[in-house]
């Protein structure tokens, strides 16, 4: 499980070796964490934005 936090509503990348996907395990922010809008993943890892703070399971 990886914690990834958007501070000051800025986009933040969190390093992760993603093979099959990422699942949001627990949202820690009042700001919504919506896949494809305020969080997602790519070859660099997990990204969050607009105040999304959450814990993610990497598969």
Feature-to-residue mapping (PLM):
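Extracellular, modular beta-sheet/disulfide-rich ectodomains of secreted and cell-surface proteins
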Residues: 1-59
């Amino acid at each position: 499980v990886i914690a990834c936090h958007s501070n000051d509503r800025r986009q933040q990348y969190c390093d992760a070796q993603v093979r099959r996907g990422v699942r949001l395990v627990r949202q820690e922010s009042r700001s919504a964490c919506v896949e494809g809008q305020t969080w997602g993943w790519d070859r660099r890892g997990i990204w969050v934005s607009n105040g999304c703070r959450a814990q993610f399971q990497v598969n």
